[in-house]
């Protein structure tokens, strides 16, 4: 129970500050923001709270509240809060803070105790009395909702001095932990995702399990635990057939134990006699050591082992027993990146305890053991482990036997890869492991071998490779019981994205309220002319290349997500209204170009407590915040508030304005910045003090007469975005000239082009 030990609710009042019983805090609205938002870059759960009567009672006015809460959650002392030091949150409680803020910290602490640490949370008042918006970092929505419910229950108990003990706190933590285990990524997948995040590679979960996309669009790679896009289905099938694997390895000079596939227990004994005792009996297509019995020397043992192995696989194999230690070598992309050594698990009798009791006291009490994937060692369950029961029977014991004091009882002979030995692997052993993975056809493989000393070649010690496993578990290397953890997640990430490849495609985000759909279409048109298969999500629909595949309003998170998972897409343009950012967050984590056209539209956002245009700065700055360091923000210099977002950008800034006298332009150009503006009825590209006309595009008066649906500001923003993306200037000018502003005309033009011979020059869809 750790930090929860001894936590109790104080049952007596210690002062006369307030003895009122309070109604529950009402949770008015719960919303999961799946991408960057006005709060943070990461997904958060946003909760609208109505404190009711508690609005008039901060924490220092509720009798005994701080003592009760800190007794229940002692680790709150570690929360710095806004004070910036240990004990900061306790100081805020003592001085007086409101219950919405307290709930934020309670939920965060429950997540920490459940093994999903988070340090981010905020609580802000709204324009309505007693109503607050509270958010906290949420890597999984369902986990966050359970943590919120449990935290709400705990907080109200502490406020009202209701019975709530350490046991109740532990139940709350267990409920959150159970949801983590049920919903969140397994440890192997999480390690790879974490390594990708460290490298700045985005990830997207594709199902409720461990299927994850790393990167975007055409540059993505997918993983499923330790299987990747490069993992061969044929290789997996070969690895699952142990006899075929051995045959292929032997033909390539890899040492393997001789063996035979048998159909029944009698054949198993005959094979054992042919091979020579002792032998191993195991399933031909199982893994993780299931159903494997080692060092069998008698007919009875072999036949009993057959009965253990048969339910675990389609066939049963009998192999020569190789003396030595079990080892697991992890091969990634033709290199051994980690190795672990197994150990025989034993208990020692005390003359009083049964074998079952010794297992509980000496083995299962080890904090490294657990039933969940996060533990490096498994719990040992005697009642359901036929292999263990057979092992005890070989020693003339069972679970109820009481071994004499000092007697060592073998519990498990294999499957306990707990000790890191990566630095000890001999180069010839590593070569054999890499060759085995290559022969089977796996980019990532767990190579099981037996050797007396992993630091010496296999041949002289008669060592051998006994299995090649597809989709190997990584936990033994991430959390070895003995030795140093190995960065296997990073090794797999580097294998998938060599040479520091970011896994990204050009992403252009368009934020604002005025003419943003046609602007997004024009940008997508120019990118497509530049040679990239382009996806577009905007209010006019969802487009792949020049085809509209969905006519519904697609300026939202779901439509953007559809583009980013599409392997055919080489660039995307996504329109983001303020409501999209407030309701869902952005569909992407970072972008190469972020465009902000204006800060209008507050009147439509009253449901989000946005009532003034000045509040839009906090919302639409999100688009600027996510621009990559090597990217560009394209900002409307005609609106000083939009131009004022420039310092928030990690990358470069291009300003645009129809009025060349816009105040922001002069200062920006004087500092050497780029700008797109209008002079002499022409589009001008400015780089510091140097200016030139955009080639390929003539007088704007003529152009605007034939492109009625495109505002001058949208034209300038699109030119700036294309310039930032490195599209040739003459192609930008020609593309703007050829753009079909009217959507229906563009759709009709595309339909017509599809009925003509390929050589017919037809206007294509923007």
Which residues does each predicted region cover?
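ATP-dependent carboxylate activation and anion-phosphoryl transfer catalytic cores
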Residues: 2-198, 335-338, 343-350, 354-357, ...
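Extended, charge-rich helix/loop segments that form flexible
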Residues: 358-416
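Residue-level signal for inorganic ion chemistry
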Residues: 196, 448, 537, 575, ...
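Active-site nucleotide/adenylate-binding loops and adjacent lid/helix of ATP-dependent enzymes
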Residues: 20, 221-380, 427-430, 489
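Conserved N-proximal alpha/beta basic substrate-recognition cap immediately N-terminal to
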Residues: 129-131, 135-274, 287
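Acidic, Mg2+-coordinating active-site environments of NTP-dependent enzymes
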Residues: 504, 583-765
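Walker A (P-loop) phosphate-binding motif
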Residues: 499-545
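Conserved nucleotide-sensing/catalytic segment adjacent to the nucleotide-binding pocket
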Residues: 547-584, 596
């Amino acid at each position: 129970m750790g930090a929860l030990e001894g936590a109790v609710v104080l049952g007596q009042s210690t002062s006369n500050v307030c003895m009122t019983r309070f109604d529950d805090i009402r949770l008015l609205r719960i919303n999961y923001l799946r991408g960057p938002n006005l709060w943070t870059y990461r997904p958060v759960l946003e909760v609208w709270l109505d404190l009711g009567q508690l609005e008039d009672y901060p924490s220092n006015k509720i009798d005994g509240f701080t003592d009760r809460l800190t007794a229940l959650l002692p680790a709150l002392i570690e929360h710095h809060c806004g004070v910036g030091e240990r004990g900061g949150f306790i100081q805020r409680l003592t001085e007086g803070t409101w219950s919405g803020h307290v709930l934020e910290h309670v939920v965060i602490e429950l997540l920490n105790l459940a093994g999903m640490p988070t340090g981010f949370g905020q609580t802000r008042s709204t324009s309505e009395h007693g109503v607050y918006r509270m958010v906290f970092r949420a890597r999984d929505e369902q986990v966050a909702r359970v943590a919120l419910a449990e935290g709400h229950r705990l907080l109200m108990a502490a406020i009202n001095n209701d019975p709530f003990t350490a046991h109740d706190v532990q139940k709350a933590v267990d409920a959150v932990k159970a949801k983590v285990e049920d919903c969140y990524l397994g440890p192997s997948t999480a390690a790879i995702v974490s390594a990708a995040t460290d490298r700045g590679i985005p990830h997207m979960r594709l199902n409720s399990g461990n299927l994850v996309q790393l990167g975007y669009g055409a540059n993505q790679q997918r993983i499923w635990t330790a299987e990747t896009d490069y993992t061969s289905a044929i290789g997996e099938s070969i690895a699952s057939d142990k006899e075929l694997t051995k045959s292929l390895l032997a033909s390539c000079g890899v040492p393997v134990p001789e063996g035979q596939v048998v159909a029944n227990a009698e054949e198993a004994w005959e094979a054992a006699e042919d091979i020579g005792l002792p032998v191993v009996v195991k399933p031909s297509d199982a893994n993780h050591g299931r159903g494997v019995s080692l060092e069998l020397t008698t007919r009875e043992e072999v036949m009993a082992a057959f009965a253990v192995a048969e339910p675990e696989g389609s066939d049963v194999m009998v192999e020569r027993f190789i003396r030595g230690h079990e080892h697991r070598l992890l091969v990634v992309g033709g290199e051994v990146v980690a190795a672990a050594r197994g150990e025989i698990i034993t208990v020692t009798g005390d003359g009083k305890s049964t074998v079952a009791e010794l297992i509980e006291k000496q083995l299962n009490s080890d904090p490294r053991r657990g039933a969940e994937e996060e533990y490096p060692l498994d719990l040992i369950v005697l009642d359901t482990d036929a292999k263990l029961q057979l092992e005890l029977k070989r020693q003339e014991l069972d679970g109820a036997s009481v071994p004499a004091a000092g007697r060592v009882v073998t519990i498990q002979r294999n499957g306990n890869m707990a000790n890191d030995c990566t630095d000890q692997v001999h180069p010839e052993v590593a070569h054999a492991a890499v060759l085995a993975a290559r022969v089977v056809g796996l980019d990532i493989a767990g190579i099981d071998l037996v050797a007396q000393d992993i630091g010496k070649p296999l041949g002289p010690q008669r060592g051998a490779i006994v299995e090649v496993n597809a989709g190997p578990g990584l936990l033994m290397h991430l959390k070895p019981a003995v030795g140093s953890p190995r960065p296997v997640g990073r090794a797999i990430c580097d294998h998938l994205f060599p040479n520091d490849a970011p896994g990204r495609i050009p992403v252009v985000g368009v934020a604002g309220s005025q003419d943003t759909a046609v602007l997004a279409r024009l940008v997508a048109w120019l990118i497509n002319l530049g040679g990239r298969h382009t996806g577009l999500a905007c209010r006019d629909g969802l487009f792949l290349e020049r085809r509209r595949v969905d006519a519904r309003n697609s300026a939202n998170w779901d439509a953007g997500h559809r583009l980013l998972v599409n392997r055919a897409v080489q660039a995307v343009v996504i329109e983001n209204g303020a409501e999209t950012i407030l309701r869902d967050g952005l569909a992407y984590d970072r972008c190469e170009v972020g465009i902000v056209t204006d800060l209008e539209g507050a009147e439509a956002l009253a449901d989000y407590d946005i009532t003034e245009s000045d509040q839009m700065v906090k919302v639409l700055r999100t688009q600027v915040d996510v621009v990559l360091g090597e990217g560009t923000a394209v900002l409307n210099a005609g609106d000083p508030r939009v131009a004022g977002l420039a310092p928030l950008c990690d990358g470069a800034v291009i300003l645009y304005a129809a009025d060349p006298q816009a105040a922001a332009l002069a200062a920006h150009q004087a500092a050497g910045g780029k700008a797109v503006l209008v002079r002499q009825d022409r589009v001008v590209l400015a780089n510091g003090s140097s200016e030139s006309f955009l080639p390929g595009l003539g007088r704007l008066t003529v152009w605007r007469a034939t492109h009625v649906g495109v505002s001058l500001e949208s034209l300038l923003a699109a030119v700036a975005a294309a310039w930032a993306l490195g599209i040739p200037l003459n192609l930008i000018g020609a593309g703007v000239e050829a753009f079909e502003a009217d959507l229906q005309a563009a759709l009709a033009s595309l339909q017509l082009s599809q009925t003509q011979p390929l050589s017919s020059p037809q206007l294509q869809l923007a």
